[in-house]
């Protein structure tokens, strides 16, 4: 929630179970209503991730405008606002969370831009990356996956439930981590049984007819 200090953001992260990535919903024009519904249903963290089929991100001014809408919703619901990839945009948007992929800006350099108050997350796709992110200086949480193949990451091979099991067994009591990739109501039980307490979802909520109900159903599965 924009306005929290680093301690408050990290305390909220520890409690977070359900993390949502969404595009700006430009064609639908319902970003504010969608965000309110998803957050009301139980989403703890909402990240703007809007890329074209070719992988190009939104122009900065459009990204900041969408983030402003999400920030207002986060304030209303006590949720955390996340920015994907861009440390400069995270700083400009006063985001709570910056999420970095393996090929993005190094954590040390990102920290120079966003400072120590912002939570920084890492994407991991195999055991070596997950083990590294679990101890990497400057990282607050990490994601493991994709558990299953997903159109939001075309061409990326699924890591499967084995990565979830490994992380739960060897890194389950350290910094927070989330399973990600193709997770929905049809398979979330498998992810939980493999040891995940927290998940990241996309289509399970963004494509739902009732985002509030979809979020609530997923949240119930996580306890």
Curated annotation (Swiss-Prot):
Binding site for 2-[(2R,5Z)-2-carboxy-4-methylthiazol-5(2H)-ylidene]ethyl phosphate: 150-152, 182
GO terms under cellular component: cytoplasm
Keyword Cell division set for record: no
Pfam families: TMP-TENI (PF02581)
Known EC number: 2.5.1.3
Superkingdom of the organism of origin: Bacteria
Reaction equation(s) it catalyzes: 2-[(2R,5Z)-2-carboxy-4-methylthiazol-5(2H)-ylidene]ethyl phosphate + 4-amino-2-methyl-5-(diphosphooxymethyl)pyrimidine + 2 H(+) = thiamine phosphate + CO2 + diphosphate; 2-(2-carboxy-4-methylthiazol-5-yl)ethyl phosphate + 4-amino-2-methyl-5-(diphosphooxymethyl)pyrimidine + 2 H(+) = thiamine phosphate + CO2 + diphosphate; 4-methyl-5-(2-phosphooxyethyl)-thiazole + 4-amino-2-methyl-5-(diphosphooxymethyl)pyrimidine + H(+) = thiamine phosphate + diphosphate
Keywords annotated in UniProt: Magnesium, Metal-binding, Thiamine biosynthesis, Transferase
Annotated Mg(2+) binding sites: 85, 104
Known function: Condenses 4-methyl-5-(beta-hydroxyethyl)thiazole monophosphate (THZ-P) and 2-methyl-4-amino-5-hydroxymethyl pyrimidine pyrophosphate (HMP-PP) to form thiamine monophosphate (TMP).
Protein's name according to its UniProt entry: Thiamine-phosphate synthase
């Amino acid at each position: 929630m924009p306005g929290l200090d680093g301690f408050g953001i990290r305390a909220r992260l520890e409690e977070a179970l359900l993390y949502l990535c969404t595009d700006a919903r430009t064609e639908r024009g319902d970003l504010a209503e969608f965000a309110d519904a998803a957050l009301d249903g139980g989403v703890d963290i909402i990240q703007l991730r809007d890329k074209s089929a070719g992988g190009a991100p939104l122009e900065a001014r459009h990204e900041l405008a969408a983030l402003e809408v999400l920030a207002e919703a986060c304030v209303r619901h006590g949720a955390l606002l996340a920015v994907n990839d861009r440390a400069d945009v995270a700083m400009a948007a006063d985001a709570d969370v910056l999420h970095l992929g393996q090929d993005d800006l190094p954590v040390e350099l990102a920290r120079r831009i966003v400072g120590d108050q912002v939570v920084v997350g890492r994407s991991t796709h195999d055991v070596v990356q997950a083990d590294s992110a679990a101890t990497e200086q400057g990282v607050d949480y990490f994601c493991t996956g994709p558990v299953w193949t997903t159109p939001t990451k075309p061409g990326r091979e699924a890591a499967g439930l084995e990565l979830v099991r490994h992380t739960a067994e060897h890194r389950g009591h350290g910094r927070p981590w989330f399973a990600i990739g193709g997770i929905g109501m049809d398979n979330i039980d498998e992810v939980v049984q493999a040891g995940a307490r927290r998940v990241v979802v996309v289509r399970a909520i963004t494509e739902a007819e009732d985002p509030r109900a979809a979020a609530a159903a997923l949240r119930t599965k996580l306890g």
